């Protein structure tokens, strides 16, 4: 039996105020089957929009994971997105509605085999 494998990044995204859609860098998740992303707004303002984990088989055509959307990231709030990985590539996507001045959003992730 193979041991469970993990890959973590505590500094995947560190962004200031959101003023447009924001896409994280592509993560090659080929050997993994589950992903969790922790999205934290450490400031007091609330950027409004939806956050998603996106999936792709070819690193070109992306779809939003069903059920991964979370609305506004309130000041001081932590959101956890968790999903089974059925594609080779994954990334974070922020679908902008309106910005929260001085918001400081960070994203970390954990992949699990």
List each model region and its residues.
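Exposed aromatic-hydrophobic patches
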Residues: 24-26, 77-84
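Aromatic, loop-rich ligand-recognition surfaces of beta-strand-rich domains
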Residues: 26-39, 45-48, 108
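Solvent-exposed serine/threonine-rich low-complexity stretches and specific carbohydrate-binding patches
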Residues: 8-11, 65-74
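Noncatalytic modules at the cell exterior or secretory-pathway interfaces
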Residues: 33-37, 84-103
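Extended, low-complexity, turn-rich repeat/linker tracts enriched in Gly/Pro/Ser/Thr and Asp/Glu
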Residues: 41-49, 97-102
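Residue-level signal for short segments within beta-strands and strand-turn junctions
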Residues: 41, 55-57, 111-113
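C-terminal interaction-tip segments
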Residues: 1-22, 26-28, 95-113
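Short, surface-exposed beta-strand/strand-loop-strand elements in extracellular ectodomains
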Residues: 46-61, 106-108
């Amino acid at each position: 039996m193979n041991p469970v494998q993990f890959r973590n990044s505590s500094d995947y995204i560190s962004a200031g105020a959101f003023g447009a859609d924001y896409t994280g860098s592509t993560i090659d998740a080929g050997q993994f089957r589950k992903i969790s992303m922790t999205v934290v707004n450490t400031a007091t303002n609330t950027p409004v929009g939806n956050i998603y984990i996106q999936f792709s088989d070819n690193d070109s055509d992306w779809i939003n994971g069903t059920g991964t959307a979370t609305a506004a990231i309130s000041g001081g709030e932590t959101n956890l997105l968790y999903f089974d990985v059925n594609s080779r590539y994954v990334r974070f996507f922020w679908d902008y509605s309106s910005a929260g001045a001085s918001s400081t959003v960070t994203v970390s992730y954990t992949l699990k085999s």
